[in-house]
A protein has these predicted regions:
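Class I SAM-dependent methyltransferase SAM/SAH-binding core
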Residues: 1-40
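A short acidic, Gly/Pro-enriched loop at the edge of an enzyme's catalytic core
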Residues: 39-51
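A short SAM/SAH-binding and catalytic strip from SAM-dependent methyltransferases
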Residues: 49-63, 86-88
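A short glycine-rich, Lys/Arg-flanked "PGG" loop and its adjoining helix->strand segment in the class I
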Residues: 64-79
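Conserved class I S-adenosyl-L-methionine
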Residues: 79-101
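Conserved S-adenosyl-L-methionine
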Residues: 103-114
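Conserved Class I S-adenosyl-L-methionine
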Residues: 112-173
Length: 173
């Protein structure tokens, strides 16, 4: 909207998520959603000015392949914005994986407590939605998945057992 990009591409492994996103964003010009594998991006070298990855790389089988692929598809001078979480004892492993020689980390921030505050702020609304729209039998699972207060993920963030990070890289020219 502000920068008038020639194209925007959303990629998801799930064809159902692609269909949902396509239907939800029909009116957005130059935006396409495609099904694909983040560890094997089906784009030419140096295609994108910006790659954004939010809360998904922790699900990848081989995240280092994903980071290599981002490096490959980014144009020189391009930006990679990444936000995700890892167990505290896996952060140093992630740092080694993501610290590629072809880009420079421009921003590196732990945002775990910001995430906890956001979860606190939306807690009541999530609980109300779950109570109104989810069958009683499934409510416990939905509370866990949504990260409400008292859930395992909420407690892990609160106790700093899981670290939530935001990083921005620029590919070297």
């Amino acid at each position: 909207q502000y920068y008038k990009p020639e194209m925007m591409v959303g990629l998801d492994y799930s064809p159902y998520a692609v269909d949902l996103a396509t239907n939800m964003h029909k009116g957005v010009q130059n935006l396409n959603f495609i099904q694909g594998d983040a560890e094997k991006l089906d784009f030419a070298k140096e295609t994108f000015d910006v790659v954004i990855n939010v809360e998904s790389s922790h699900c990848y089988g081989t995240p280092e392949l994903f980071f290599d692929e981002v490096m490959r598809v980014l144009k020189p001078g391009g930006w990679f914005s990444w936000v995700d979480f890892r167990p505290k004892d896996k952060v140093s492993e992630l740092e080694k994986m993501i610290d590629l020689p072809g880009w420079e980390c421009k921003r590196n921030k732990v945002i775990t407590q910001d995430v906890v505050r956001a979860l606190d702020n939306i807690h009541d609304r999530k609980m109300k939605m779950i109570a109104q729209h989810v069958p009683r039998l499934l409510r416990g699972s939905f509370r866990e998945f949504s990260g409400v207060k008292g859930s395992k993920i909420y407690n892990a963030f609160s106790n700093n057992e899981i670290v939530y990070m935001a990083k921005t890289f620029q590919k070297k020219i």
